[in-house]
Amino acid sequence: MSGERLAIAAVAAAACSWRAPADWSVLAFSDRQLALKSQDDRRPPAAVVNDLLRLRGRGTTDLDGALRSSARQLERSRAKRRVTILLSDCRATAGVDPQAAARRLDELWVIAPEDDADDAAEFARRAGARFATVGGAFDIPAALAAVL
């Protein structure tokens, strides 16, 4: 992940922190998952965004692992709605089929790049998830407003 997709993720993380200042998580994933801000961590949003902006995409994508990590984070949430927002093209290249993990989540929203959304749209349809596309970071507020 780099460039515009990284900017999209940074804006999304900042928006989530603003919307639910005490009850949010940010996970980055490839073949493993990294909690940039776990559910019970009180990190400043700016530190989370800075860490996100330092990431560089690499390797394979374990979507199942990412969704299971999200479920573990949300187990600690006090929110009435436990929403997973997945920013991804949804091409799982490692791990097992992520559909079962996706269907176990309370509420899943898939937000995909509008120029690379076909696999994500199909994944969302099969998982029973809501779906949106974004053309850039400026589209994130409207996409998140629809979600939250």
What do the PLM-derived regions correspond to, one by one?
Residues 1-42, 44-87, 91-94, 111-121:
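Von Willebrand factor
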Residues 18-21, 76, 103-106:
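Arginine/glycine-rich "motif VI" loop of SF2 helicases in the C-terminal RecA-like domain
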